């Protein structure tokens, strides 16, 4: 039986990255639910398209056991994350990431996804692919220059243009 995936979409989210995951999951019969890293289900893509997703991240807290994997879908919200780190939805984001990681669930992400995983301490000793500008921020994991890395339960890609290099392995692991 296919696994169930919690997809985190920051606001704004990179639509190119988000929809690669969603379309691949849909086409392969993998169940997913999209959670806005926001206080509302209405978010935007980097290009301004309005999306209404399934739920908000606050409602994922405490329900981590209902999912087998977590996707962090990056976007323009990440470069300004530090300015908004104390917002309840970003506090929830970090708690949810840490909980999924500590439970050994599949951790999937691109661009700054590995950096967000690393901030929680769950990447210790794991090879991760991350956006080149975020590479110096990796303190626990091992940042590489590869387009994507798969190390244990971590599936990471440098950016939305390299998700395709890991997506077949992500789908295989989720089926």
Curated annotation (Swiss-Prot):
The keyword Zinc applies. One of its GO terms (cellular component) is cytoplasm. It comes from the Bacteria. Keywords: Flavoprotein, FMN, Metal-binding, Nucleotide-binding, Zinc. GO terms for molecular function: metal ion binding; nucleotide binding. InterPro entries: Class_I_gatase-like, DJ-1/PfpI, Prot/Nucl_acid_deglycase. Riboflavin binds at residues 161, 164. Homodimer. Binds flavin derivatives, such as lumichrome, riboflavin, FMN, and FAD. May act as a flavin storage protein. Appears to lack proteolytic or chaperone activities. This is Protein ppBat. It comes from Bacteroides thetaiotaomicron (strain ATCC 29148 / DSM 2079 / JCM 5827 / CCUG 10774 / NCTC 10582 / VPI-5482 / E50). The lineage of its organism: Bacteria, Pseudomonadati, Bacteroidota, Bacteroidia, Bacteroidales.
